[in-house]
Amino acid sequence: MDIDPYKEFGATVELLSFLPSDFFPSVRDLLDTASALYREALESPEHCSPHHTALRQAILCWGELMTLATWVGNNLQDPASRDLVVNYVNTNMGLKIRQLLWFHISCLTFGRETVLEYLVSFGVWIRTPPAYRPPNAPILSTLPETTVVRRRDRGRSPRRRTPSPRRRRSQSPRRRRSQSRESQC
């Protein structure tokens, strides 16, 4: 089966493959970041978002993989075989986990649309011949600052008019919208 873990989030393995392997922080750094930013939501029994669920699954998979690696390390007598297994896990599986963790942490931090925009921008930048591209790659944290924000009141005239005397404002106090969830997801 060829399963793309990013498909339901609007991305693909190919889209993430434009980012070089050294772009992604270490698994330890990503786990620390996830814990620092989203520990409460990740440990909560409530469903917060598909990104939280995917992040939980990636963290659990990494834990199981480390358990297996420890077992292999303790039970393989041949140092060369042990090194092959460790290198394979770190190179192949480690990269996939680092990509997954980075993607979901970034989506929770910056928003899915911003992350997808970044991946497309970086993909275009990296495929453009060096002579024709800007010297610096796009930076994820700067994308929201350069995004165009449209005003809500596009149909209104810029000058506000005072209400006509016929219309009276309601005497009841305005109601605040209360959050439907108490946990912070």
Curated annotation (Swiss-Prot):
Pfam families in the record, alphabetically?
Answer: Hepatitis_core
Write out the annotated subcellular location.
Virion; Host cytoplasm
**Which InterPro entries does the annotation name?**
Hepatitis_core, Viral_capsid_core_dom_sf_HBV
S-S pairs: none
Sorted keywords for this record are: Capsid protein, Cytoplasmic inwards viral transport, DNA-binding, Host cytoplasm, Host-virus interaction, Microtubular inwards viral transport, Phosphoprotein, Repeat, RNA-binding, T=4 icosahedral capsid protein, Viral penetration into host nucleus, Virion, Virus entry into host cell
Origin species: Hepatitis B virus genotype A2 subtype adw (isolate Japan/Nishioka/1983)
Q: Where is this region: Disordered?
A: 136-185
GO-annotated biological processes: microtubule-dependent intracellular transport of viral material towards nucleus; symbiont entry into host cell; viral penetration into host nucleus
User: Where is it mostly found?
Assistant: virion
Select a single GO molecular function from the record's annotations and give it.
Answer: DNA binding
Post-translational modification here is noted as: Phosphorylated by host SRPK1, SRPK2, and maybe protein kinase C or GAPDH. Phosphorylation is critical for pregenomic RNA packaging. Protein kinase C phosphorylation is stimulated by HBx protein and may play a role in transport of the viral genome to the nucleus at the late step during the viral replication cycle.
In this UniProt entry, the residues modified to Phosphoserine are 157, 164, 172
> What ranges does the record list as Basic residues composition bias?
149-178
Q: Where is this region: 3 X 8 AA repeats of S-P-R-R-R-[PR]-S-Q?
A: 157-179
Kindly state the positions of the motif Bipartite nuclear localization signal in this protein: 160-177
- What is this protein's function? Self assembles to form an icosahedral capsid. Most capsids appear to be large particles with an icosahedral symmetry of T=4 and consist of 240 copies of capsid protein, though a fraction forms smaller T=3 particles consisting of 180 capsid proteins. Entering capsids are transported along microtubules to the nucleus. Phosphorylation of the capsid is thought to induce exposure of nuclear localization signal in the C-terminal portion of the capsid protein that allows binding to the nuclear pore complex via the importin (karyopherin-) alpha and beta.
Where are the annotated segments for RNA binding? 179-185
Description of how the protein assembles with itself and partners: Homodimerizes, then multimerizes. Interacts with cytosol exposed regions of viral L glycoprotein present in the reticulum-to-Golgi compartment. Interacts with human FLNB. Phosphorylated form interacts with host importin alpha; this interaction depends on the exposure of the NLS, which itself depends upon genome maturation and/or phosphorylation of the capsid protein. Interacts with host NUP153.
Protein name, as recorded? Capsid protein
What's this protein's family per the entry? Answer: Belongs to the orthohepadnavirus core antigen family.
Annotated sequence repeats reside at 157-163, 164-171, 172-179
Q: Which GO terms describe its cellular component?
A: host cell; host cell cytoplasm; T=4 icosahedral viral capsid
Source organism superkingdom: Viruses
